[in-house]
Curated annotation (Swiss-Prot):
Factors inducing expression: Expressed in the early phase of the viral replicative cycle.
Transmembrane segments: 101-121
Source organism (scientific name): Vaccinia virus (strain Copenhagen) (VACV)
Residues of the site described as Cleavage (By host protease): T96, T97
PROSITE patterns tied to this protein: EGF_1, EGF_2, EGF_3
Protein name (record): Pro-vaccinia growth factor
Length: 142
């Protein structure tokens, strides 16, 4: 039983590699056969599979009853019904430039930091100016 699943997995990987290259499945679908019979393990669905896969090709696996979908590029899901979303940053036009305007909150924080630094520098300047004006006799230690 595990050999059948291994063959199915191998066939799915081959089909997926052909799908990524953009080739049509009718021309690239490998014919995987069992040693005892000449019936392909994976084949395209017949007329019963028309419309089963919304954005892809219907595949029937001999060992597992049921139909499965091989989704086209950009789609995912059991029946290829979901669109794969691309990153917004990569989908933008590269020729456009984006300018960022800082919010008023950020501007207030920056102005506050500048005011605090200015106040600290002024207090240090005033303190050193006062100590420099002291007479020399006040600085002598008894």
């Amino acid at each position: 039983m595990s050999m059948k699943y291994l063959m199915l997995l191998f066939a799915a990987m081959i089909i997926r590699s052909f799908a990524d290259s953009g080739n049509a499945i009718e021309t690239t679908l490998p014919e995987i056969t069992n040693a005892t019979t000449d019936i392909p393990a994976i084949r395209l669905c017949g007329p019963e599979g028309d419309g089963y896969c919304l954005h892809g090709d219907c595949i029937h696996a001999r060992d597992i009853d049921g139909m499965y979908c091989r989704c086209s590029h950009g789609y995912t899901g059991i029946r290829c019904q979901h669109v794969v979303l691309v990153d917004y940053q990569r989908s933008e036009n590269p020729n456009t430039t984006t300018s960022y305007i800082p919010s008023p909150g950020i501007m207030l924080v920056l102005v506050g930091i500048i005011i605090i630094i200015t106040c600290c520098l002024l207090s240090v300047y005033r303190f050193t100016r006062r100590t420099n004006k002291l007479p020399l006799q006040d600085m002598v230690v008894p």
